[in-house]
């Protein structure tokens, strides 16, 4: 399995809007992606950043999702700072 790891910055006052966009757009799109297994989206305690870990069956699936994530417009107040594909090497 492979993970797409995305890190974002969230502008002041935009956390609720970012969460709404996440629930209404990002998560449903991720679920439909080829090879999707599971996804986790996290927010920093201060609400200024977030990190997601989305698991895919194959490296090409994760790479395609990463390309889409990098090419898609972010919600207002959200800036994508990194998109990486990593191999899942252990699971508990």
Say what each PLM segment does:
Residues 1-50, 57-68, 78-92:
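Short S/T/G/P-rich N-terminal loop/turn motif that feeds into the first structured element of a domain
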Residues 69-73:
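RNA recognition motif
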């Amino acid at each position: 399995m492979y993970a797409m790891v995305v890190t974002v910055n969230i502008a002041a006052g935009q956390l609720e809007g970012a969460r709404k966009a996440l629930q209404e757009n990002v998560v449903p799109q991720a679920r439909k992606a080829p090879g999707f297994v599971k996804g986790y989206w996290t927010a920093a305690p201060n609400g200024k950043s977030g990190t997601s870990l989305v698991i895919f069956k194959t490296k090409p699936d994760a790479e395609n999702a990463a390309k889409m994530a990098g090419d898609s417009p972010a919600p207002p107040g959200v800036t994508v700072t990194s998109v990486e594909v990593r191999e899942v090497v252990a699971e508990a």
